[in-house]
């Protein structure tokens, strides 16, 4: 499900074939207003659906319609971008790394009641992916798919840039250090928890965020822009809500209380009755310093991990990769932040 085109564009670069180049051959039920793109990724027939908007309500509506039109649906992958914690468990997390949902909980009205458990059909796969052995395999496969995506984007002369933005653009401030004008702005000065629209639309350099306030971190490698980057993959509990997380203090408070590793906006809208795995690339640190520099690259790393996951999901295909008849088994790729 894509509320932003950038997530869908990244996913579509990893389609191996399209079944709908001459128009939609499968149709949809009368009440379904979703838009679909169908094709093949690896050994699976896939359908990508684009949401009408952001948030859990839009996700619920799109998922229900999808299930009605594609009754043979076996797996939903909710693929896109998210805000992540700078440290997950005992590891530093960096922009471009990918999180995979072990559980999804709504942080707008979060209750630790066990909700958000993955569907029973995907629990064995998630348990396998959580092993060190499969994690290494997944990471290696995702790195290959990322290079394929970048090459395909180049060949198609895509406007979007999917290469690594560079370690120097991966910076983080303390959670209490807000992204706001440091002087000459009454709105930013009057409320410590508020910053003006102009600040929100400006870069850290433009509004005077002080470089000496940055948290010093050792990157895995001091990679320049455009370098090869193999994303780390974290499997854990994701927070999901209808509002964008953009406070370092709120991020850390909620993460500590509910043991979440990242924040996104659609996963909680897809109920336990749907076989769903959320795969999101970290494009910011869920604080007030968020920007769009990493969004395309994070969408690309998430799409690459999603394709790697699909390779280990059982297929009902007989090995003949042709446009399937209506009623065939389908796998859905959703993407959004």
Name what the model sees in each region.
Residues 1-334:
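Intrinsic-disorder/coil detector with helix-boundary
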